[in-house]
Amino acid sequence: MKNLFRPLIVIFAVLTAVTGLAYPAVMTAVGQAAFSDQANGSMLEQDGKVVGSKLIGQQFDAPQYFWGRLSATSPMPYNAQGSGGSNLGPTNPALLDEIKGRIDALKTAGTDMSKPVPVDLVTSSGSGLDPEISPAAAAYQIERVAKARKLAANDVQALVDRYTSGRQFGILGEPRVNVLQLNLALDEMKHG
């Protein structure tokens, strides 16, 4: 019986050491050495203080800032612990109420409503944490942000263009604009 358990205990100990200690330690070391920014959460700083991650959206609702997608997390917007979609189907009246509420907020903030509203400004993403919007959603907000900040619309457009990322490897995903990075650049523009 003793001979039966000895190999099992040895295999268990070796696999625990390899998969539970050695592999995570090596991957952590490689991540820190080769991809330090990403391994530490892709944090963004302003005036030497961490203000957020470029991977997690933040709530912006003041007219002088670009607004991101709606957050489906509750009870607080952009709460990473509550990540998940709203699960509201296209025929659910609550989804329509949510969309109407966002359109009303855009009107109240002074957005020109003569153009069609980009869908990503009035719907939440699958995770509820999306940090990016489409270039169309950013362009839709340029006039409002420029007016609120007393800037030329062309200057704000140039900033949007600068912070627009293309498709990954030229084929994956869609062009996108990181809202937090764009808003931080706007704040720098005002201070600088």
UniProtKB/Swiss-Prot annotation:
Coiled-coil segments on the chain, per record: none
Keywords: ATP-binding, Cell inner membrane, Cell membrane, Ion transport, Membrane, Nucleotide-binding, Potassium, Potassium transport, Transmembrane, Transmembrane helix, Transport
GO molecular function: ATP binding; P-type potassium transmembrane transporter activity
Topology in the lipid bilayer: Single-pass membrane protein
Keyword Transmembrane tagged: yes
Membrane-spanning ranges: 7-27
Annotated InterPro entries: KdpC
One Pfam assignment: KdpC
Signal peptide interval: none
Top-level taxon of the source organism: Bacteria
Subcellular location: Cell inner membrane
Major location (coarse): membrane
Entry GO CC: plasma membrane
Similarity comment: family membership: Belongs to the KdpC family.
Record-linked HAMAP family: KdpC
Subunit structure: The system is composed of three essential subunits: KdpA, KdpB and KdpC.
Record's function text: Part of the high-affinity ATP-driven potassium transport (or Kdp) system, which catalyzes the hydrolysis of ATP coupled with the electrogenic transport of potassium into the cytoplasm. This subunit acts as a catalytic chaperone that increases the ATP-binding affinity of the ATP-hydrolyzing subunit KdpB by the formation of a transient KdpB/KdpC/ATP ternary complex.
Protein name: Potassium-transporting ATPase KdpC subunit
Gene this chain is encoded by: kdpC
